[in-house]
């Protein structure tokens, strides 16, 4: 069952969950059907991530997805969600130019989608921008460690926060908390470093490839439930094999058509 006991989850419930030692659950969602299922299952937060560029639109990188595309997906998720807190990524190119640009992008997301918060990547360097968004009345989730929008400057998909760089991870996390973020995603960082950050902060930490010491976990649902039949990251645990099930179902459908057994009497008027 969910770690948060509420009919409608608000940002304050995440801080309360941390104080009470309750773990929180997060899944990505990009459409109404998956959002409804995950919401009814009891997930605490639904993240409309820019990972939609990969798992929905078939692109190689998250850098290409636009704010307009994110808004279309987020609208579908919020329409279907009654309980979970819906958070929407600000995609690459929508907040880096200036804090004013970031506030305008965040306002569009909130006004046009009905989401409860936005997520933004970056550490100390983005703290002022986060403060401006928060001051505009918009809740923010931060994202540090491996940040996919910075994949080229980081040298690819590599673990962050090892050795001496663990100090930067803590500094980034503190900066986001001081800027007003109510939660922060820690992606692909050593478990011990993530645990130290979690113990240092009063806001919620959400891990992805960051060990079991964070306040919660997030996975891309197509990875977690096996819709993606390709290679998956090491940190993914597969809870179902939906890709294989859909493949087999499609083959059965095709076979019934070729055999002339579908539709039958039960499916006819």
UniProtKB/Swiss-Prot annotation:
InterPro entries assigned: Pantoate_hydroxy_MeTrfase, Pyrv/PenolPyrv_kinase-like_dom, Pyrv_kinase-like_dom_sf
Q: What is this protein called?
A: 3-methyl-2-oxobutanoate hydroxymethyltransferase
How the cofactor binds, per note? Binds 1 Mg(2+) ion per subunit.
Cofactor entry? Mg(2+)
Query: Where along this sequence does the record place binding of Mg(2+)?
Result: 50, 89, 121
Give the matching Gene3D superfamilies: Phosphoenolpyruvate-binding domains (3.20.20.60)
Location in the cell reads:
Cytoplasm
- According to the record, the signal peptide region is none
Tell me the enzyme class: transferase
What keyword terms does UniProt attach to this protein? Cytoplasm, Magnesium, Metal-binding, Pantothenate biosynthesis, Transferase
Pfam families this protein is in?
A: Pantoate_transf
Alphabetical GO CC annotations of the entry are: cytoplasm
- Source gene? panB
Q: Where does 3-methyl-2-oxobutanoate bind?
A: 50-51, 89, 119
Biological process annotations from GO? pantothenate biosynthetic process
Which EC number(s) does the record attach to this protein? Answer: 2.1.2.11
Q: How does it assemble?
A: Homodecamer; pentamer of dimers.
- Write down the superkingdom of origin: Bacteria
Write one Gene Ontology MF term. Answer: magnesium ion binding
Q: Which residues form the active site?
A: 187 (proton acceptor)
As for what it does, the entry says:
Catalyzes the reversible reaction in which hydroxymethyl group from 5,10-methylenetetrahydrofolate is transferred onto alpha-ketoisovalerate to form ketopantoate.
Q: SUPFAM superfamilies from the xrefs? A: Phosphoenolpyruvate/pyruvate domain
Q: Which reaction does it catalyse?
A: 3-methyl-2-oxobutanoate + (6R)-5,10-methylene-5,6,7,8-tetrahydrofolate + H2O = 2-dehydropantoate + (6S)-5,6,7,8-tetrahydrofolate
Lineage, uppermost ranks: Bacteria, Bacillati, Actinomycetota, Actinomycetes, Mycobacteriales
């Amino acid at each position: 069952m969910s770690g948060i006991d509420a009919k409608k989850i608000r940002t304050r419930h995440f801080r309360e969950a941390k104080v009470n030692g309750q773990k929180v659950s997060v899944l990505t969602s990009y459409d109404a059907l998956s959002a409804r299922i995950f919401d009814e299952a009891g997930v605490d937060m639904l993240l409309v991530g820019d990972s939609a560029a990969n798992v929905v639109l078939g692109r190689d990188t998250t850098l290409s997805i636009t704010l307009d595309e994110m808004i279309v997906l987020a609208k579908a998720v919020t329409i279907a969600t009654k309980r979970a807190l819906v958070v929407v990524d600000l995609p690459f190119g929508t907040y880096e130019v200036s804090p004013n640009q970031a506030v305008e992008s965040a306002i569009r997301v909130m006004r046009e989608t009905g989401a409860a918060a936005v997520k933004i990547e970056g550490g100390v360097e983005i703290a002022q921008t986060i403060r401006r968004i928060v001051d505009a009345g918009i809740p923010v989730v931060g994202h540090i460690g491996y940040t996919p929008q910075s994949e080229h400057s980081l040298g690819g998909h590599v673990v962050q926060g090892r050795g001496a760089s663990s100090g930067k991870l803590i500094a980034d996390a503190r900066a986001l908390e001081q800027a007003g973020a109510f939660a922060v995603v820690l992606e692909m960082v050593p478990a011990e470093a993530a645990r130290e950050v979690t113990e240092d902060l009063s806001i919620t930490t959400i891990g992805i490839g960051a060990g079991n010491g964070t306040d919660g976990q997030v996975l891309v649902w197509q990875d977690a439930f096996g819709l993606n039949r390709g290679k998956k990251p090491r940190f993914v645990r597969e809870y179902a094999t939906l890709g294989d099930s859909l493949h087999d179902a499609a083959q059965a459908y095709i076979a019934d058509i070729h055999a002339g057994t579908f539709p039958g009497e039960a499916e006819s008027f």
